[in-house]
């Protein structure tokens, strides 16, 4: 995955939460980050919803969210556009999915027991991953790794 700090505007990086090599944004910033990434020629490398607190983080769900691989007949700019369109569609499905919303509420209730006064909107972040044309990424391998991590917890 690519380091977004090398490509994205400073104002978008300033509103991100960074932990290690991962950058995360709030829901309100997602479309702007997607648009800026597309303009820079960065493809979506997937994403994960997390509750982030000073004490740690908790994934909203263990399902992997990765766009499809680049097709042989697809140019890089075409793939970049498609990867972000698939990502936007996945975001919308997540926001419309009542089961996921309920899971988030259950997780957040546990977090609130240890973090007094914390509001859900202040803790919900979306970790985004990026790819460049120079990277050859095996999405199926990523999915297996992410799902095995989820199954082990």
State the predicted function of each range.
Residues 150-153:
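Short acidic DE-rich linear segments
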Residues 31-32, 54-62, 134-144:
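Short, solvent-exposed polar/charged micro-motifs at secondary-structure junctions
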Residues 48, 53-97:
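Amphipathic alpha-helical packing elements
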Residues 27-56:
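Amphipathic, interaction-prone secondary-structure segments
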Residues 1-27, 33-34:
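Long, hydrophobic N-terminal alpha-helical segment
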Residues 91-148:
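Amphipathic alpha-helical binding modules
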Residues 12, 33, 83, 87-91, ...:
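Generic structural signal of hydrophobic/aromatic residues within well-ordered alpha-helices
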Residues 3, 21-28, 70-74, 78-86, ...:
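Alpha-helix boundary/N-cap detector
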